């Protein structure tokens, strides 16, 4: 027998252990079964899962469990993205090891990462995540790095990889280059500095406006709009930069916004992307004034060695002393920052560096065309990828100046020739491994290793190829070929809105260039998790909630329901009250099955399932099968929120509040045939509800299955059963009308009992229901209404009741008449009681009443008295309630 209370902390770990021990989710290659491969996102190994992980991976788990129940052979691996700057920072801090000791440093990075993986895997298991852990992969594994490097060699052979000096996004704090997808603009308060630049011929000044006066040493031109009447006459002249006494030209370009600041700007190498465009467009010189560490270099003259912020302040002060800084305006503007890592968020500089690139800009049209062949959920997320592809200014920077990462498998000579690693040597680390040749095969020069490592998106952008064993299949492995052919393209890529322009974009590009195919059939996008206050979760806001705070209190299933309520593609705030409601829903579900267990556990459903059912049974099963159809259709579209709401409402209200309450009298009654029919319907209803809920709340459904159904069915897990089958023959519109009417009648009677302080199971002696259009339906459910509401005598009467409203009591409002009539009040009260009906009529018609008491005239307005009326039917007082065309009389 199920215990009285639902305790997730007892049942959830039990079933998690059971699933692992019994290998319930073990993947086996079965070519005869349809494949469903999921390209799961490998989270960065930070050591802990946040609620964003819980949301996205619960969605994935719901899909995997559903597809297994639909008969698919579900390939559901889970990987971990290991490389990255945060790990290096952790190792430096915790172990005190410098990157100048690369071999020892790498060992500690790997050691720390394994600890993080163990913690995160345990957290995944604790939320009921049903991956096949035998297929777990790690981007730091040698075989994984070999696959990544093999893909790089293929790209190199195609002429897609090159090395050149180019302005790159540079993070001075992290000391590395970044891809465009790793940076973003943040709205911040700052200053706009208005500076007069002297004309070189001494004829005057041109005013410019800039947010970065510290970049003056890198100024190579001043730009104005060609149609700006204020400055047309100055185009072609030169200005002499104050402090540096260097002359630069004044040029005209249509990209200048004449409404910003003064309408004139200076072009520095490099303040922003526009500076790059102008430098290349006009073949201007390049002057760099900022070091990699965010300090000013020797080109900054007197400001060399200062941090950027210090130099900005100092040069502004000096220009003001010279009379050239004439205005400083506080503004809100966009600042480019390292937004991909919230632990950094440092301002980004654009520095020219020798970096490694993959050609991608020339393929953006191809990428968009491939993306069109993928089903996007929601559809408008495709536009984000398209917009990103069309906005790219330069190719993909794939090199990073770090230690812990997949090594770039190349050597270079002093003349710039690239020497790739041999495929048979992969994985290689040029920092430590012997090169494939002694000298450059092109020019004979000495060669040196490439010490940069790859951007982590290079690792993770081949995950659909990794999980389908492309890297083994291309070597000729026959088993891997079968695996690849069965599972590629993968069925699904689930991911967040924040990485459409990185993970989705680069995966489509890389997979297409390596295979000529799309990586997946479907892509489903979840939004970000916000804090309880609706703002982005942040320690600075104090609104961060971790899974470890939620699960001990409410369990994983209640938290999973919160994730399932998130709309696709939209941000979803964490709300404690929603999780609390979910927990109460699960307790309600538990109570339903606990009640039903004694009636259906030993019931032979197969023997009686074809019996003709009663109207309310047909109603609830018709509603059930509509839900089955709806849930199946919406799951195919990944709209979990719609299904979850529909299921929870159906179970809590139609099933628990109404149907079960309306069949209790049959289950405990003496009519054996009626009892049998109720059991058939109850079994079918609860068995299918359990299956519908299984992907969403896997723990409680497993517990219910083992308690009530396993003995008869035999399968060792609810998650190995088939998804409910929609039956058209169960749809009964007439029964649905009857069921809805029954719900409304019972609801009205419950309100009556509640208003009189009666328990819901209290007996009602006499109730009559008068109806016209609904009379026949009411006759059908007469016994159910009487049994449900414990009515001793229930009449269903065709027609309308003859009702008469009478005044039964009139009471004075003492605080109004007391001061006016004093000692006469008792006699006034007596007069009111003896003439209640007449006084009530006169008050209604005239708004007041006049009479004499002991010779004194009494005048009472309607505000002076309280009139109580009652309804009578055939001389007997009744209370009434109206439901549609039916009038309920309570005697």
UniProtKB/Swiss-Prot annotation:
Positions that bind ATP: 539
Span of the annotated motif 'KMSKS' region: 536-540
EC number: 6.1.1.9
Entries under PROSITE patterns matching the protein: AA_TRNA_LIGASE_I
GO cellular component entries: cytosol
Record key words, sorted: Aminoacyl-tRNA synthetase, ATP-binding, Cytoplasm, Ligase, Nucleotide-binding, Protein biosynthesis
Motif segment ('HIGH' region): 43-53
Official protein name in the record: Valine--tRNA ligase
Lineage, uppermost ranks: Archaea, Methanobacteriati, Methanobacteriota, Thermococci, Thermococcales
GN (gene name): valS
